[in-house]
Amino acid sequence: MSITVGHTTFDRVRYDAEADVLYLHVGDPSQAVDFDESPEGHALRYDGAGKLVGITLVNAKQLLDGAKPIVITIPERVTIDPAALAPAVQSAA
């Protein structure tokens, strides 16, 4: 499964149902060397070249239950249709 956010396609998608956290990564998560937080509170991970390689969404189920687009500023502001993330969260249920 892959999920595209803005111009980045994340090919590693993992949902931790116990913690309700959705992890999105491009390739090996260990390539992330810099970390930041979006204004909306989502964790962002970058590689050595400054390219976005990971997003962590806390309270993923709550975000999906709202049925409103999820906003992430990375640095441009993007929205994600909850339906695009739902399969990742539902697969762990």
Identify the residue ranges that each predicted region occupies.
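Ser/Thr- (and often Asn-) enriched beta-sheet segments in non-cytosolic proteins
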Residues: 4, 9, 71-73, 79
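Phosphate/ribose-recognition catalytic cores of enzymes acting on nucleotide-derived substrates
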Residues: 10-13, 44, 69
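A short, polar/charged loop-to-alpha-helix boundary motif
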Residues: 62-74
